[in-house]
Swiss-Prot record:
One of its GO terms (molecular function) is single-stranded DNA binding. The RecF protein is involved in DNA metabolism; it is required for DNA replication and normal SOS inducibility. RecF binds preferentially to single-stranded, linear DNA. It also seems to bind ATP. The lineage of its organism: Bacteria, Pseudomonadati, Pseudomonadota, Gammaproteobacteria, Moraxellales. This is DNA replication and repair protein RecF. It holds the Pfam family SMC_N. ATP binds at residues 30-37. It comes from the Bacteria. It is found in: Cytoplasm. SUPFAM superfamilies: P-loop containing nucleoside triphosphate hydrolases.
Length: 358
């Protein structure tokens, strides 16, 4: 979905924002605190139902307001969200109310590229698992269904483990069966997807870090050689003792291996940032190969990447057909790259919450 029109109301310090004629690349510049990042935050809210800055709606909904509204339109779709202080939300697609955020997310695949962040590499398995599941959601039609059933079974099993200190295998058997069935399904889907992803990853890695060999390895979160059912039986007593489910796809990881060891241990901060870019760009490329285009949020592009890296990133995103929303303090550096690559763009000045096309 390529956004042609964007309306934002009551998000942080932004005045009512009404943008039309959006281009493949849209650059928002202005002083720190002017509201640039809040525009990206609003688009992120619309696509995912979450802010990338806070979990608390009261922090991004304007003071004394009860809600925030974000609306976007493409040539063929109209999507909108009303987010309430309570965290509840109302979602509409082409005027019809829809039940789940997933329906909206399917229409608006979105990646947030933060050049200052190395969380995917440094902060344990969870952000890497979330990265993998973003890809799964968009390329594997049955993933969301399997994940929903697996998550419900896991929640029920963990509740039992927490409420009873003594549990027999028979008491857990219904949940073990459900976990095993849908967990193995998730594992099979992830295994196939990661194998496909590896080729895309190596292509983007070669462009951004040509002197490094890094392998992407999938760890399923359980002993796949014996199967999840057997793990649940073998570790029954330990699960009862710990009062949670130790093994399963909810503990999966993506391991990034170099010849010298794990990437988080041996790479410099600059290399980690480029590795993070390669991971996300390769996912965007994989969607592009399936005729799905990704909206990309690029916050503070010029702050952490040198000029060559900026140009390579912009060129690659253009090749992948992405619509890109960029914030920067140095718009001249960004427009110089875009002009040099003959890429269409629109420039916006953001000043004290007011957004004006330049």
């Amino acid at each position: 979905m390529q956004i042609t029109r964007l309306n934002i109301e009551r998000v942080r310090n932004l005045k009512a924002v009404a943008l039309s004629g959006l281009q493949p690349f849209n650059i928002f510049y202005g002083a720190n605190g002017s509201g640039k990042t809040s525009i990206l935050e609003a688009v992120h809210l619309l696509a995912t139902g979450r802010s990338f800055r806070t979990h608390m709606p009261k922090h991004y909904i304007q003071q004394n307001a009860q809600d925030a509204i974000i609306f976007a339109q493409s040539l063929s779709e109209k999507i909108g969200m009303q987010k309430l202080l309570s965290g509840e939300q109302l979602i509409k697609v082409n005027g019809d109310t829809v039940a789940t955020q997933g329906q909206l997310a399917k229409l608006l695949p979105l990646q947030h590229l933060d050049p200052q962040s190395t969380d995917i590499i440094d902060h344990g398995a969870k952000p890497r698992r979330q990265l993998l599941d973003w890809l799964m959601f968009h390329v594997e039609p049955e993933f969301y269904f399997a994940w929903q059933y697996y998550s419900r079974a896991l929640k029920q099993r963990n509740m039992l483990l927490k409420t009873k200190r003594q549990l027999s295998l028979a008491e857990l058997e219904p949940w073990n069966k459900m976990l095993s069935e849908y967990g193995e399904m998730l594992h099979s889907q992830r295994l196939v997807t990661v194998e496909r992803w590896k080729d895309f990853f190596q292509q983007d890695l070669a462009q951004l870090l040509p002197d490094l060999q890094i392998e992407l390895e999938y760890s399923p979160g359980f002993h796949s050689e014996v199967g999840l059912w057997q793990d649940l039986l073998n570790y029954h007593n330990k699960d009862v003792e710990r009062r949670y489910t130790e093994y399963g796809p909810h503990r999966a990881d993506l391991r990034l291996k170099t010849a010298l060891g794990d990437a988080d241990d041996v790479l410099s901060r600059g290399q980690k940032k480029l590795l993070m870019m390669a991971l996300k760009l390769s996912q965007i490329a994989m969607l592009h190969a399936s005729n799905k285009e990704t909206v990309v949020l690029l916050d503070d592009l010029t702050a952490e990447l040198d000029s060559n890296a900026q140009r390579r990133l912009i060129e690659r995103l253009s090749q992948l057909g992405s619509q890109v929303f960029i914030t920067t303090l140095d718009h001249q550096a960004v427009t110089q790259h875009l002009d040099g690559l003959s890429i269409s763009y629109q420039l916006y000045n953001v000043d004290h919450g007011q957004v004006h096309a330049v």
